[in-house]
Amino acid sequence: MAIIKEAVVATFPDLVRVIQNGADRIELNADLAAGGITPSKGMIAEAIQYVHDHDKEITVMIRPRGGNFVYNDIELKIMEADILETQQLGADGVAFGALTDENTLDEDAMENLIAAAGGMTITMHMAFDALDHEEQLHTIDWLTDHGVERILTHGGDLATPIDANINHLKELLAHAANHIGILPGGITSANYETIAKTLTVYQVHGTKIVD
């Protein structure tokens, strides 16, 4: 099975470059220095048109700010509105995540956001990596039960090399048991084939996934 290379971009020139260099799917962000936040409506619209013209798929990041993933009611309203707008513009999918002050999945918030995203694929983004191990396993089950398609994870702190997180990623994959996709993040063009083979996954994600 061919490996799906999901490239993270935040500018239109980068979008064009990664499509030309073999990206299969796009995750569109703004402000990667902040870890990626929701792009502008204009950027989303132009990116969707370009990606679809090239017969690829696009997921849009829904995140109102950098920092943690604990959101107040107003921020959650913003996220819901951004999801609905992204849906109207024709995106294939959205990526989001919300946690509680106790560092657990904010299930109430996630239910509302998932409902708003009807008709699009949903990715739980790297907020997942902020959870402890037991909560990650519970979250995999909860997301599976609520129709989320995949979970983006580095398997540990983003500063750690992916090789150091292989065993943890294998545990997550075993627990997911193919009921939900585990999308390894922080992967590069230099290591994606090795990582995909080691983990037996068919999709990988990163800002440097294509040259």
What is the role of each PLM region?
Residues 32-33, 65-67:
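A short, flexible beta-alpha/helix-coil linker loop
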Residues 3-7, 26-28, 56-62, 94-96, ...:
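Hydrophobic faces of well-ordered beta-strands that scaffold small-molecule active sites
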Residues 45, 101-104, 109-112, 123, ...:
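Active-site pocket-lining/capping segments in soluble small-molecule metabolic enzymes
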Residues 1-32:
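N-terminal entry module detector
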Residues 12-16, 32-57, 73-76, 99-118, ...:
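Active-site-adjacent beta->alpha loops and helix N-cap segments on the catalytic face
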Residues 24-37, 85-102, 146-161, 187, ...:
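Glycine-rich phosphate-binding active-site loops on the catalytic face of alpha/beta enzymes
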Residues 10-21, 60, 67-85, 129-146, ...:
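Catalytic cores of alpha/beta
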Residues 54, 89, 117-120, 146, ...:
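Helix C-cap/helix->beta junction micro-motif
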